[in-house]
C-alpha cells in the first residue's frame, strides 16, 4: 500500500554577509542572528534571506554604497570581494508564514503599528512591529518566518510607497 507521505517543499534562499562571517556560518552550520536598533533593521530580530541571489548582491551594494563614496572600498567590485552570498535551503510551509501578501496578516500588522504609534507618540519601524508581534503577542508559536515585500535601493522612511518591491524573509 502507498504511504501518504507529505513531501516538504524546499526552496533555496540567499543571505549576503561579510566573507569571514560567511565562512564561520558554513563551518559551524549556524548563522548569527541579526539584532539591531538601526532603522535599516526592517523585519525585526532574526535571520534575513532573499528569494533571488541578485537581491542579496543588491542589498550588499545598497548597504555599503556610502562606504564606496568614502573610498573605504575602491569600487563596487572591490566591495564584493569582501562579501559573499550564502545559499540556504528552507522548507516552505505557507501556513507558518506571516506575510503582507495575506490580507488578514497585513491588517493585523497595520492595527498593531497604529496602536504602537498611539502608545509611543511617534512613528515606529516595521521591525518594532514585528518584534512586538513575535515577542510580546507570541506569534513565534504560530509562525516560523515573516515574508514581507520591501522597497529596495532608496533611503526609506516609514510609511513609504511600496515601489520597487523585493521579497525578503526574516526567520
What is the predicted role of each segment?
Residues 56-62, 69-70, 96-101:
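Short, solvent-exposed secondary-structure capping/transition elements
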Residues 11, 44-47, 83-87:
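Extracellular structured ligand-interaction cores
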